[in-house]
Amino acid sequence: MKIAIITGANSGLGYASTQALLNEGYYIYMACRSEEKAVEAINSFDLQFRDKVEYVHCDLSSFDSIRACADHILKNEKQLNALMLNAGLMATPPGETKEGYEMQIGVNVLGHALLADLLLPLIKTTPDARVICLSSV
């Protein structure tokens, strides 16, 4: 079974991508900030898919949360076929990440860069693995 991680998988393009990859036979890790929203999304999938999707907490504004997410994947998987870097913020009120970076840059760029870097060893050992980055401009 192919394995994918999708950030921001509980809504929008992340949710649609989760549905599409479930239909293709993937096991999906929904890397989301809100467990409540992720569980709501999981419960909306057909019953046949609910055992092929798992919520994993990933707050992209916190390097500690990103590291914990990556550690969970690295401890539980021997391959990673797709990493979809989808989550993002736009037009947010002024604020900073836990590490002191401007929130939008911290989440949309630095958080995803750290997650990809931490998962790169697993991606590199998986034949035909893909990293997909989504962005709005």
Predicted regions and their residues:
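A short helix-coil junction within the Rossmann-fold of NAD(P)-dependent oxidoreductases
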Residues: 76-77, 93-95, 118-127
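Conserved glycine-rich Rossmann-like NAD(P)H-binding loop of the short-chain dehydrogenase/reductase
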Residues: 24-40
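Rossmann-fold scaffold of SDR-type NAD(P)-dependent oxidoreductases
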Residues: 7, 80-88, 133-136
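Conserved glycine-rich cofactor-binding loop
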Residues: 8-12
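The beta1-alpha1 cofactor-binding region of Rossmann-like NAD(H)/NADP(H)-dependent oxidoreductases
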Residues: 35, 56-71
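Short alpha-helical oligomerization interface
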Residues: 92-106
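A glycine-rich helix->loop->beta "capping" turn
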Residues: 49-53, 72-85, 91-96
